[in-house]
Swiss-Prot record:
Belongs to the complex I subunit 2 family. InterPro entries: NADH-Q_OxRdtase_suN/2, ND/Mrp_TM. It is a multi-pass membrane protein. It is an enzyme of class 7 (translocase). One of its GO terms (cellular component) is plasma membrane. This is NADH-quinone oxidoreductase subunit N. Its EC number is 7.1.1.-. It comes from Paracoccus denitrificans (strain Pd 1222). One of its GO terms (molecular function) is NADH dehydrogenase (ubiquinone) activity. It catalyses: a quinone + NADH + 5 H(+)(in) = a quinol + NAD(+) + 4 H(+)(out). The chain crosses the membrane at residues 9-29, 37-57, 76-96, 104-124, 126-146, 161-181, 196-216, 235-255, 269-289, 301-321, 324-344, 369-389, 402-422, 446-466.
Length: 499
């Protein structure tokens, strides 16, 4: 390892060093006595590493012979992932302490999961991709089953582990096919092989299997089966984490793989991604209608939103990737605010997740109800909230790429999905007489609700440079907008060239 390699992976080294030091400190200095302190130190560590990544004077480069890539795309995804993880940990502190759930291992395992996510988005090789993905997955299996005294939590962890192992096997099988037919595991080598005209059927099959394995991580249909049960059974802070940082990292990883390794066959993979997007948008929108548990409802919401993000990716253009990154950023912010509210829901000191508990909540706490209304409108894509512009961006990218049919289906799915978000608003403002709930929040949790709600309104006016940062990140991965051939045009041009 050279000094250049070390400087390239310095943020990851810092986070890994912190996680190991915290693990040793917790084991030797009194375990759960340090739990709350370790949680807040972990939040600080995430923010420090995010500052190192986002504010440092970086030069795009690679380490370990191209296995690890440091560029604008990876830095943007890392900052969003780190800040989202910090937000979830911070808003969960009071809740976990009140429920006697806070253990010193929790923030450390989350830190290790985030470390895996950082490697995922910087992967330049199939081996790095798998290493980062498994580091994240193994940590998430543990936190899903964190409540060992809860049958539902143990069940959630087991389901996630079994289906996660299956997806990892499919991913490995696809990677082995690509390696066998391309002769290399490096993304640069794979795309060079394809560019030289050696695109075999085996490589395409390998790509399909890898996309199947990665679709599990973003809960894309038909690989979403684990999501509702795991979201409902896991402790609510863990569900909040599942719904934010891992989704951002996994979507960024898919973008990294398809553009860096398979960027010359956009016409081949964009149709697969588009099919996943359509199925996810519609199943998430329709299946969520009949849900009565808000955590389970948010699981189907997550499935639908991943479908919309995949629309931007299916466009196969820099503007599509830019809007996908913006969509995932806005999605993470919306979910932090929504889960801050869900964490506060209780009746007689006991957490509740039943939608009926929201009946006439606006009458008892109008400020929090208004914040939740804004977040629900944004999740539904109602103008003028930021969620509307996020959906508009990815659908516009699809139209520009010659995939107008995909945009039309996206609009239909969005209209269907708006029902269950607006139903929550209906319960809060016009629900029937029933035993209600109280909303108990600490100061940090209150901020975690109010700041995202305010951002959904203010962001419609100005995103304070986040949109331009996403644009630069997309151009780093894909290239300038003008230099990108549209997938539909590429697919039509290929047969002509062969004649």
């Amino acid at each position: 390892m050279t000094s250049l390699d070390f400087s390239t992976i310095l943020p990851e080294v810092v986070l890994a060093g912190y996680a190991l030091a915290a693990l040793m400190a917790g084991a030797y200095l009194g375990k759960d006595r340090l739990a709350r302190t370790l949680l807040w130190v972990t939040v600080a560590a995430f923010l420090v590493v995010a500052a190192m990544v986002g504010l440092g004077n970086h030069v795009d480069g690679a380490a370990f012979h191209g296995m690890f890539i440091d560029d604008g795309f990876s830095r943007f995804a890392k900052v969003v992932t780190l800040v989202a993880a910090a937000g979830v940990l911070a808003m969960s502190a009071d809740y976990m302490q009140r429920r006697n759930m806070l253990r010193f291992e929790f923030p450390i395992i989350v830190a290790l999961a985030v470390l895996g996510m950082m490697f995922m988005v910087s992967a330049g090789d199939l081996l790095t991709l798998y290493m980062g993905l498994e580091l994240q997955s193994l940590a998430l299996y543990v936190v899903a089953a964190m409540r060992r005294d809860s049958v539902r939590s143990s069940e959630a962890g087991l389901k996630y582990f079994v289906l996660g192992s299956l997806s990892s096997g499919l991913l490995l099988y696809g990677a082995s096919l690509v390696y066998g037919f391309a002769g290399t595991t490096g993304f640069e080598g794979i795309i060079s092989t394809i560019e030289a005209g050696h695109l075999s059927l085996g490589v395409l099959f390998g790509l399909v299997f890898m996309l199947v394995g990665l679709s599990f991580k973003v809960s894309a249909v038909p690989f979403h089966m684990w999501t509702p049960d795991v979201y409902e059974g896991s402790p609510t802070p863990v569900t909040a984490f599942f719904a934010t940082a891992p989704k951002v990292a996994a979507m960024a990883l898919i973008a990294r793989l398809v553009f860096d390794a398979f960027g010359h066959v956009i016409g081949d993979w964009s149709q697969i991604v588009a099919a996943l997007a359509v199925m996810s948008m519609f199943l998430g929108s329709i299946a969520g209608i009949g849900q009565t548990n808000i955590k389970r409802l948010m699981a189907y919401s997550s499935i639908a939103h991943m479908g919309f993000a995949l629309v931007g990716l299916a466009a196969g253009t820099a503007i599509g990737v830019q809007n996908m990154l913006l969509y995932m950023t806005i999605y993470a912010v919306m979910n932090i605010g929504t889960f801050a509210f869900i964490l506060s829901m209780e009746r007689d000191g006991v957490p509740v997740t039943d939608l009926a508990a929201l009946n006439r909540f606006a009458w008892t706490d109008p400020v929090k109800a208004l914040a939740m209304l804004v977040l629900m409108f944004s999740l539904a894509g109602v103008p003028p909230t930021l969620g509307f512009f996020a959906k508009f961006g990815v659908l516009t990218a699809a139209v520009d790429a010659g995939m107008g049919w995909l945009a039309v289906l996206g609009v239909i799915a969005s209209v269907i999905g708006a029902f269950y978000y607006l139903r929550i608003v209906y319960y809060m403002y016009f629900g029937g007489e029933s035993e209600g709930m109280t909303s108990r929040m600490g100061a940090v949790q209150y901020l975690a609700l109010m700041v995202p709600a305010l951002a959904m309104l203010v962001g419609a006016i100005s995103m304070f440079g986040v949109d331009s940062a996403a644009g630069r990140a997309a151009e780093t991965l894909v290239g300038p907008v003008a230099a990108i051939e549209q997938p539909a045009e590429a697919a039509q041009a290929e047969p002509v060239q062969g004649e």
